[in-house]
């Protein structure tokens, strides 16, 4: 049974048996998460074609996704599939990196306590400094991504003791989803978000596609041209293309 939260205003769309929230725009998503007296609790997970395919073969990942309350369309292919399957759908792509920045800006305005996990030590330090300078974010703790498995419980206790209401984890999938799942068992009173390489992008260590490429839905192509080694990952996505055009969504 899925733990996905349902509301009258935010529709759910199902792609390959995976329910996904369909948001009209970024502002609606941010307002939805901050609609109460404090930010919502639960787990945010970005959904793209690669993750859909992986979840079909990886039972553990599928279980993690089923338990996440807020699954949103991060990949343009997911948005196009939703529109194909549900012609009246008013849904847009919500890029995880952009959502993270929008939530951090809102957290700064609201005074929401934030805990950052993941990234290299220097990148994490730069991320903290920029968040404080740019949006006055209330960062109550942090931990880089280089810690031993036996240190996990101590990290979970630090997060709990900090009183953080928003925890972001930059460790890549599925490591970040596993960490968030386990941390929520220890401390459920926060919103958790897996952000992959967002800290690197935010601090300028990794360059995103120009805005025109993003608006055309070609960010994947820009990444491929920048990192030719990704070609093998792109070949795997041909299976999703077949799902899309055959209507097996």
Swiss-Prot record:
EC numbers: 2.4.1.180
Reactions it catalyzes: UDP-N-acetyl-alpha-D-mannosaminouronate + N-acetyl-alpha-D-glucosaminyl-di-trans,octa-cis-undecaprenyl diphosphate = beta-D-ManNAcA-(1->4)-alpha-D-GlcNAc-di-trans,octa-cis-undecaprenyl diphosphate + UDP + H(+)
GO MF term (any one): lipopolysaccharide N-acetylmannosaminouronosyltransferase activity
Keywords, alphabetical: Glycosyltransferase, Transferase
Residue ranges of coiled coil: none
InterPro entries per UniProt: UDP-ManNAcA_Trfase_WecG, WecG_TagA_CpsF
A Pfam short name: Glyco_tran_WecG
Annotated pathway: Bacterial outer membrane biogenesis; enterobacterial common antigen biosynthesis
GO biological process: enterobacterial common antigen biosynthetic process
Functional note: Catalyzes the synthesis of Und-PP-GlcNAc-ManNAcA (Lipid II), the second lipid-linked intermediate involved in enterobacterial common antigen (ECA) synthesis.
UniProt-listed NCBIfam families: PRK03692.1, wecG_tagA_cpsF
Name of the protein in question: UDP-N-acetyl-D-mannosaminuronic acid transferase
Lineage per the UniProt record: Bacteria, Pseudomonadati, Pseudomonadota, Gammaproteobacteria, Enterobacterales
């Amino acid at each position: 049974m899925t733990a996905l939260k349902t509301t009258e205003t935010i529709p759910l769309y199902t792609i390959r048996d995976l329910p996904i929230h369909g948001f009209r725009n970024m502002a609606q998503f941010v307002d939805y998460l901050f609609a109460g007296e404090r930010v919502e609790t639960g787990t945010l997970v970005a959904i793209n074609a690669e993750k859909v395919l992986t979840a079909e073969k990886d039972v553990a990942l599928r279980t993690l996704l089923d338990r996440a309350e807020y699954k949103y369309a991060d990949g343009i292919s997911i948005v196009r599939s939703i529109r194909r399957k549900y012609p009246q759908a008013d849904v847009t792509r919500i890029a995880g990196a952009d959502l993270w920045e929008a939530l951090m800006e809102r957290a700064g305005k609201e005074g929401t306590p934030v805990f950052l996990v993941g990234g290299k030590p220097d990148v994490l330090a730069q991320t903290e400094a920029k968040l404080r300078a740019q949006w006055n974010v209330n960062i109550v703790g942090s931990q880089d991504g280089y810690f031993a498995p036996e240190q996990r419980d101590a990290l979970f206790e630090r997060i709990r003791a900090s009183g953080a209401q928003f925890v972001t984890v930059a460790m890549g999938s599925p490591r970040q989803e596993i960490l968030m799942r386990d941390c929520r068992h220890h401390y459920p009173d926060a919103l958790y978000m897996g952000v992959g390489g967002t800290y690197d992008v935010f601090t300028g260590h990794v360059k995103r596609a120009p805005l025109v490429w993003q608006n055309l839905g070609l960010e994947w192509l820009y990444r491929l041209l920048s990192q030719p080694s990704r070609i093998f990952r792109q070949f795997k996505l041909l299976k999703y293309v077949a799902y899309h055009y055959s209507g097996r969504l």
